[in-house]
Swiss-Prot record:
Belongs to the bacterial ribosomal protein bL21 family. This protein binds to 23S rRNA in the presence of protein L20. It comes from Heliobacterium modesticaldum (strain ATCC 51547 / Ice1). HAMAP family: Ribosomal_bL21. This is Large ribosomal subunit protein bL21. GO terms for cellular component: cytoplasm; ribonucleoprotein complex; ribosome. GO terms for biological process: translation.
Amino acid sequence: MFAIIETGGKQYKVQQGDVLKVEKLEANPGDVVEIDRVFAVSKDGELKVGAPTVEGAKVLLKVEDHGKGKKIIIFKYKPKKNYRRKQGHRQAFTQVRVEAIQA
């Protein structure tokens, strides 16, 4: 059984027990977050696709941890003008575990 969900503007294909990193959620570690933006659910070989979401379907995610991703460097410059700007960024994420898929 799997589901396709949306959180943080991104779509994920999840199964029960999966661990994934999503955009930062405002929840404490140990909390259970309910996602109701479920676009498709596959159960017993039957695929149910929503228009745009599947009615009554939800996915329960347990928050395990918060963190920051790998650092990326933003560097811009203008040639011949001695203009250089260097900036780093680390995107915040939340690590979650899929507890249940209800459809």
